[in-house]
Amino acid sequence: MGIPVLAPYHGELAAKSAKFGGFKVQAFDLPHDGVPNYGFFIRMPNGERFTYLTDMEMCVYNFRKQRLNHILIECNHIDENLDEEEAKYAHVVRGHASLRVVKDFLEANWTEDLQTVILCHANALEDTGRMLREVKETVGEDVAVWMAEKRAEYWLNNEKEGDK
């Protein structure tokens, strides 16, 4: 018996939800420069709610009523740091979320239930310290905010591996 895999590039997925053990997963469209892309709303076995948002220009959906506990979201660049003359400028702007987009999403979706924000897919040349500071200012001191690192594991209880 195989393991079913949810892949973000199958067009029929956007209209589907699935269960994996105690996890309930709902896929939704995310704009990514004309390429099919999906985010995921996940209800975990303990009832907590999680969104996965990456490779996107923005998220047009609002999850305030779902009272998110955990958010993994792309924070690729800071708008004013982009060079409009650079060859990749259009690709970056049309296909990836800026710090401003992330802060707008977090402001629109913040509730007192939010516990964790993990930023991912940052441009290697960006000021990730600034990204972390500004997101922390947006969501408040009670919310754990991390920049995803390669091979790191994160527990969704405000602790990162090694923080215990």
Residue ranges and their predicted role:
Residues 1, 32, 121:
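Histidine-centered divalent metal-coordination motifs
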Residues 1-7, 69:
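Active-site metal-binding motif and surrounding structural segment of the metallo-beta-lactamase
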Residues 2, 22, 47, 114, ...:
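A generic structural signal for alpha->beta connector loops
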Residues 4-6, 51, 116-118:
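A structural signal for isolated positions on well-ordered beta-strands in alpha/beta enzyme cores
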Residues 7, 27, 145-147:
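A structural preference for short, hydrophobic beta-strand core positions in alpha/beta folds
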Residues 8, 53-55, 120-124:
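Structural motif
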Residues 10-66, 70, 152-164:
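Core dinuclear metal-dependent hydrolase active-site scaffold
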Residues 61-151:
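Cap/insert and terminal regions of metallo-dependent hydrolase folds
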